[in-house]
């Protein structure tokens, strides 16, 4: 299983135009770590899917005009740290389960979008966006959720 994870992460660490990367992870409480690495360049796509408790994801897209970054986490204890510097790009984060947290940053962009959806107790989101004509949507359903959003 360790070799499979390393191969999946290695396949996504390099970057360039019109590249797509996917890091699926399954397993309960195994402490999986999805390193999306730096998938940069225009028209890039980065997807991380995690199923099981104890997972974490770190994703960065820089100089990624017209690009998409998607993280989906199901299970307790998940966390995500996401960054994107781009125009006309999007971040879509979905977390289902207990104890999830997310930090999202989008900078130097215009016409960009961030969507955060959290379902379950104890979720938290911190969102910062430095972008013109851009949008942030945060949806939280459950107990003890909190959100902080800044747009500059």
From Swiss-Prot:
It is found in: Fimbrium. Its main location: other. Residues 1-20 form the signal peptide. It holds the Pfam family Curlin_rpt. Transmembrane segments: none annotated. GO terms for biological process: cell adhesion. GO terms for cellular component: pilus. The keyword Signal applies. Keywords: Fimbrium, Signal. The keyword Signal applies. InterPro entries: Curlin_rpt. Curlin is the structural subunit of the curli. Curli are coiled surface structures that assemble preferentially at growth temperatures below 37 degrees Celsius. Curli can bind to fibronectin. Belongs to the CsgA/CsgB family. This is Major curlin subunit. It comes from Escherichia coli O157:H7. The lineage of its organism: Bacteria, Pseudomonadati, Pseudomonadota, Gammaproteobacteria, Enterobacterales.
């Amino acid at each position: 299983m360790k070799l499979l994870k390393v191969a999946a992460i290695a396949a996504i660490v390099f970057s360039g135009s019109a590249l797509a990367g996917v890091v699926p992870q399954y397993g309960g409480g195994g402490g999986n770590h999805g390193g999306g690495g730096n998938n940069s360049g225009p028209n890039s796509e980065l997807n991380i899917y995690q199923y099981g408790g104890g997972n974490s994801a770190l994703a960065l897209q820089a100089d990624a005009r017209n690009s998409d970054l998607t993280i989906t986490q199901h299970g307790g204890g998940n966390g995500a740290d996401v960054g994107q510097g781009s125009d006309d790009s999007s971040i879509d984060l979905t977390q289902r389960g207990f104890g999830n947290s997310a930090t999202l940053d989008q900078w130097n962009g215009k016409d960009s979008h961030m969507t955060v959806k959290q379902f379950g107790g104890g979720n938290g989101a911190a969102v910062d966006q430095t972008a013109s004509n851009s949008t942030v949507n945060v949806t939280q359903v459950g107990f003890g959720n909190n959100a902080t959003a800044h747009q500059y």
